[in-house]
């Protein structure tokens, strides 16, 4: 499940920890296990409260388009998912399909060394986004991943010996 906490990013790291993360952590501790993951979305975080996000213990962290993904990836442990962060309005809504394709490729290229990175929009995609732009995003992801040897541990692919 994705837990959205965008307003927490408007706070300092200390206040985010005090007024949001401690309560989010209680929820995560109560529901997250090996078969159920929580992803914490904080599109208001521009990099100043990543530590407070990490203190929640979520399995994944979703960053908005104002965060620097390389910095976020460096600050997050390699055993958690780090997601983001193409601008849903400035890229998906406004640009051409060719530009969406190029921006998607650019983000994938600069984050390619991080196996825990999952590309996505940085926040909700507006309903007015042209379908051609969404297709361009998926085509860029497909092109980037085509031929790549993605190392996925066998235990994640095969469960219970089957």
Predicted features by range, described:
Residues 1-162:
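Active-site loop segments of alpha/beta catalytic cores
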